[in-house]
UniProtKB/Swiss-Prot annotation:
Pathway(s) annotated for this protein in UniProt: Carbohydrate biosynthesis; gluconeogenesis; Carbohydrate degradation; glycolysis; D-glyceraldehyde 3-phosphate and glycerone phosphate from D-glucose: step 2/4
Protein name as annotated: Glucose-6-phosphate isomerase
One GO CC annotation: cytosol
Keyword Metal-binding annotated: no
UniProt keyword list: Cytoplasm, Gluconeogenesis, Glycolysis, Isomerase
Primary gene name: pgi
Organism: Salmonella gallinarum (strain 287/91 / NCTC 13346)
UniProt lineage: Bacteria, Pseudomonadati, Pseudomonadota, Gammaproteobacteria, Enterobacterales
Length: 549
């Protein structure tokens, strides 16, 4: 990968000049000037997904200049480096190969001279055998009863991904009830344990090192709770499995290492749902549906790695994002799924994007003088319409939005889905084209209102429009299409990081807080006043101690 400051390229300078020409052009004008705009600025993927990016403040010239930037930053070389197993995560000296986990073609992928695919397939086969035993009821708990509940204990990538996918694929779930515990706040594990029976519960402890503070604290609390009923520690092996690489610690915990499912250093946490971390997904929807999820992601991987940049969906979305973030000064992007099953999708890619590209140092170790990752947020429609859409429509901040919806619902109740989709279509139209003062005034006249009253109301009912959106319309949310959609966003994030000359696959920003927490923890064990920190931290700790006493 080339380590080039993008702002020093001729393409960036050309984009800056182009922005000066485009900043006052409206989306309405762009549509008025081109009757074929939708056809030119939309694309389909496998007849399963339509991506419409026509309601953006872009022209063909904009995209051409953004493509020039991608070429000068050697995006094609970066893609090749990732897929070939090069150690592009240089700060940790690791390859980045979540694509290998879903490599359904089984073509060799080499890391350190070794094809990783046999090991990937071996773990998949092991998960298949284990999950079939649990789902079928063949696996028995310590009293001879079949498993009814599964509790996944993890945090970050070991929680967000599996939780998001099991919720998104809830129409495909079997009889097992899934629970997810992540927060070290004891309330989280306590509330879950109230719902389950130790005789019929399986705990999955998801920690690569088996030392993650939050996960192991919750795991030990779950173990203590279990043993209060089960008594004998040998029963732990029937009710706990591990997603880890630390066989010694797993065995010491009481888990049979035959029920330890491994993954590798080249699997980043926020890209790990495709690995053994996805065991909870398999237990929820079955192995065949998990393979479909992998297959959908693999199909998007092939699209990303082989399709020319001009028609490459992850690249196009990434470039449009850079355009807004760096030239228009947009600081956030909203992800708005119009599907209740997808209610954790925005939260998942909040981590996926912000932990990946929330960096202020470039690949040369220098502080950047441009914008890197945006703030990602969002909620399902139509809930968001009655919450924060006001600011998107009439606020002073530009918030580019991704609207996501399935054409076919899993729950065709009455006319619910038509009403949902009517809002989906209406919102992007309203954001793009707005409502002029003239239209508002005419509406008041048509209603017979007193013209003298117009000035008191009209300004507040005007919508400027010109708010950019992408619309992603899926035929239906299935394991395959969900896999493709997740991979689309993953590759968008990678593309932006490659072009912006940052390391996307490390996350050193999470370390300092953990280090300080480990120093503070012993200080909370007594009632002595603390004076070893700044006055604010001392004051907070001392008030905590006073109140808990």
């Amino acid at each position: 990968m080339k380590n080039i400051n993008p702002t020093q390229t001729s393409a960036w300078q050309a984009l800056q000049k182009h922005y000066d020409e485009m900043k006052d052009v409206t989306i309405a004008e762009l549509f008025a000037n081109d009757s074929d705009r939708f056809a030119k600025f939309s694309a389909t993927f496998d007849d399963l997904m339509l991506v419409d990016f026509s309601k953006n403040r872009i022209t063909e010239e904009t995209l051409a200049k953004l493509q020039d930037l991608a070429k000068l930053q050697d995006l094609a070389g970066a893609i090749k480096s990732m897929f070939s197993g090069e150690k592009i995560n240089r700060t940790e000296d690791r390859a980045v190969l979540h694509v290998a986990l879903r490599n359904r073609s089984n073509t060799p992928i080499i890391v350190d001279g070794k094809d990783v695919m046999p090991e990937v397939n071996a773990v998949l086969e092991k998960m298949k055998t284990f999950s079939q035993a649990i789902i079928s009821g063949q696996w028995k708990g310590y009293t001879g009863k079949a498993i009814t509940d599964v509790v996944n204990i993890g945090i970050g990538g070991s929680d967000l991904g599996p939780f998001m996918v099991t919720e998104a694929l809830r129409p495909y779930k079997n009889h097992l009830t899934m629970h997810f515990v992540s927060n070290v706040d004891g309330t989280h594990i306590a509330e879950v344990l109230k719902k389950v029976n130790p005789e019929t519960t399986l705990f999955l402890v998801a920690s690569k090192t088996f030392t993650t503070q939050e996960t192991m604290t919750n795991a030990h609390s779950a173990r203590d709770w279990f043993l209060k009923t089960a008594g004998d520690e040998k029963h732990v092996a029937k009710h706990f499995a591990a997603l880890s690489t630390n066989a010694k610690a797993v065995g010491e915990f009481g888990i049979d290492t035959a029920n330890m499912f491994e993954f590798w250093d080249w699997v980043g946490g926020r890209y790990s749902l495709w690995s053994a971390i996805g065991l909870s997904i398999i237990l929820s929807v079955g192995f065949d549906n998990f393979v479909e999820l992998l297959s959908g992601a693999h199909a998007m991987d092939k699209h990303f790695s082989t399709t020319p940049a001009e028609k490459n969906l992850p690249i196009l979305l990434a470039l449009i994002g850079i355009w807004y973030n760096n030239f228009f000064g947009a600081e956030t992007e909203a992800i708005l799924p119009y599907d209740q099953y997808m209610h954790r999708f925005a939260a998942y890619f909040q981590q996926g994007n912000m932990e990946s590209n929330g960096k202020y140092v470039d690949r040369n170790g220098n502080a950047v003088d441009y914008q890197t990752g945006p703030i990602i947020w969002g909620e399902p429609g139509t809930n968001g319409q009655h919450a924060f859409y006001q600011l998107i429509h009439q606020g002073t901040k530009m918030v580019p939005c991704d609207f996501i919806a399935p054409a076919i619902t899993h729950n065709p109740l009455s006319d619910h889905h038509q009403k949902l989709l009517s809002n989906f279509f209406a919102q992007t139209e309203a954001l793009a084209f707005g409502k002029s003062r003239e239209v508002v005034e005419q509406e008041y006249r048509d209603q017979g209102k007193d013209p003298a009253q117009l000035e008191h109301v009209v300004p507040f009912k005007v919508f400027e429009g010109n708010r950019p959106t992408n619309s992603i319309l899926l035929r239906e949310i299935t394991p395959f299409s969900l896999g493709a959609l997740i991979a689309l966003y993953e590759h968008k994030i990678f593309t932006q990081g490659a072009i912006l000359n940052i390391f996307t696959f490390d996350q050193w920003g999470v370390e300092l807080g953990k280090q300080l927490a480990n120093r503070i923890l012993p200080e909370l064990g007594d009632d002595k006043a603390i004076s070893s920190h700044d006055s604010s931290t001392n004051g907070l700790i001392n008030r905590y101690k006073a109140w808990r006493a």
